[in-house]
């Protein structure tokens, strides 16, 4: 159990301290991953950026992820085949559902990044952070997107997730760090005392603060 997202970030930090700050980049999955990643990037003194991925929900059950779609010129769709089979959705159905999520990805890119270019990832140790995962569809999509940028090492860092999801992610990156894998996992929010919604303004402020920190350091 975590007090809040910042405490989760502090506990993940203990596992990430050995990383070389000269070659590490922290990426957060908005919105819930930002307060977790904020603590880590601030303490390590490394760049913080985001990976824009949207969950694609099952029609009538939007909380159940059948896929995830990424940002970019050629958005990538990562399908949870087990969920798709149970829901009776083929890849054409999922592609149509994913297309509906693209406007929200574009909206978030505009308000979060305000035209700032992404932090270069080639040759870096890249850590992707979220506040927790259930099916892993969003994290899996993020890992595949970032892998195409040729990082030297790719790590997923999550406070809480089901053991089966963590096992499925291990083939997608070099290392998975997960602090808690409860046998009775039902929802991420149940493992936090304070799991309030993270606003767009909070995300934007965190990103802006880290961008200023790096700019000031380079002067």
Question: Residue spans of the language-model regions?
Answer:
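PRPP-associated nucleotide enzymes
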Residues: 1-219
């Amino acid at each position: 159990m975590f007090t809040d997202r910042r405490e989760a970030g502090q506990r993940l930090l203990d596992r990430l301290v050995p990383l070389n700050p000269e070659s590490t980049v922290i990426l957060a999955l908005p919105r819930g991953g930002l307060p977790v990643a904020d603590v880590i990037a601030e303490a390590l003194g490394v760049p913080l950026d985001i990976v824009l991925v949207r969950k694609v929900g099952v029609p009538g059950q939007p909380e159940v992820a059948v896929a995830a779609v990424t940002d970019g010129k050629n958005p990538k769709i990562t399908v949870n085949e087990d969920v798709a089979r149970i829901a009776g959705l083929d890849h054409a159905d999922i592609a149509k559902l994913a297309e509906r999520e693209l406007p929200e990805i574009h909206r978030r890119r505009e308000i979060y990044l305000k035209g700032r270019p992404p932090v270069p990832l080639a040759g870096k140790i890249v850590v992707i952070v979220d506040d927790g995962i259930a099916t892993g569809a969003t994290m899996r999509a993020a890992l595949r997107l970032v892998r195409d940028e040729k990082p030297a090492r790719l790590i997923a860092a999550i406070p809480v997730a089901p053991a089966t999801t963590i096992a499925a992610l291990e083939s997608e990156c070099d290392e998975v760090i997960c602090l808690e894998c409860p046998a009775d996992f039902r929802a991420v929010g149940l493992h936090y005392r304070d799991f309030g919604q993270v606003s767009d303004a909070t995300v934007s402020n965190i990103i802006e603060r880290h961008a200023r920190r790096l700019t000031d350091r380079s002067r």
